């Protein structure tokens, strides 16, 4: 069941939902694995029993929707998780009987993107990794799950006249859904500084080094201690770091009664921020979708923009994607005035 999901965060969510289902229908077993085997064995021998338990669980969740305790989308996600488990366990279930009466979930969230002021406050959080993470996600539009695969060799600076104008980043390298996007010069600087800091602290950094890793005790002399034993910071670790930073910086407060969503999501909001800022900058919509690895319908088979063409369009958005975009724009205007004078 878990092997059907590549991303650790996805596995964790599906596992949690299935576990709640097993607990609700009182499946015996001390561990999730024991409960899963029990349900799978009994479900294959008695599909009516399996269907009855699933319907009972879904009916309970629908009542919670009516009470405004959860959203319809939450119920849909429960069904997806249980359905995947049953398919992997070869339990034949008539899913039309279950899905026909499901409450409809929104196809989009009604949250917003963070403001420039909020992002500037976020990167003040006292963790050496936060700037590199925020700058990278905001200027590339990658999903938080991409950090599970991102190694140092997957990011390469692009120079013009001896100056870094952007950096190319290969996302999900070696996987079926591998693609490339770009990051801003400021994101490249933050990442390079972070990798340099790790190297001077004693870590043997190379192309295979994961871009994000755990922190270490800086009180230990350089070249010694846990700095030399890097442990990859998974996408779940990045997610938790971002959430800690948002709370610590006063950008998130306890939800008011009746509200289920915070103003903006901790990680996915940066992907939305990227798309919005690129649109404001005037990038071609199809190029934005390409850099986000979104499907563009039939154009997937016919639209073949070159890397250079995508880069040129992306460069138009650099000043809009930089957290210090106002400063960059001001510096650009100053340089233009100097040239005219």
Task: Locate the predicted segments by residue.
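N-terminal core-binding DNA-recognition domain of tyrosine recombinases/integrases
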Residues: 1-9, 18-109
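Flexible interdomain linker/hinge and immediately adjacent N-terminus
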Residues: 38-44, 91-121, 172-176, 217-226
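Basic, Lys/Arg- and aromatic-enriched nucleic-acid-binding interface segment
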Residues: 116-145, 271
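Short, charged phosphate-coordinating catalytic segments
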Residues: 137-164, 283-290
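Conserved tyrosine-mediated DNA breakage-rejoining catalytic core shared by Y-recombinases
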Residues: 149-208
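Catalytic-site neighborhood detector that most strongly recognizes the C-terminal catalytic loop/helix
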Residues: 173, 292-338
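Active-site/catalytic core of tyrosine-dependent DNA strand-transfer enzymes
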Residues: 185-261
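Short, basic (Lys/Arg/His-rich) helix/loop patches that form interaction surfaces
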Residues: 204, 239-290, 294-295
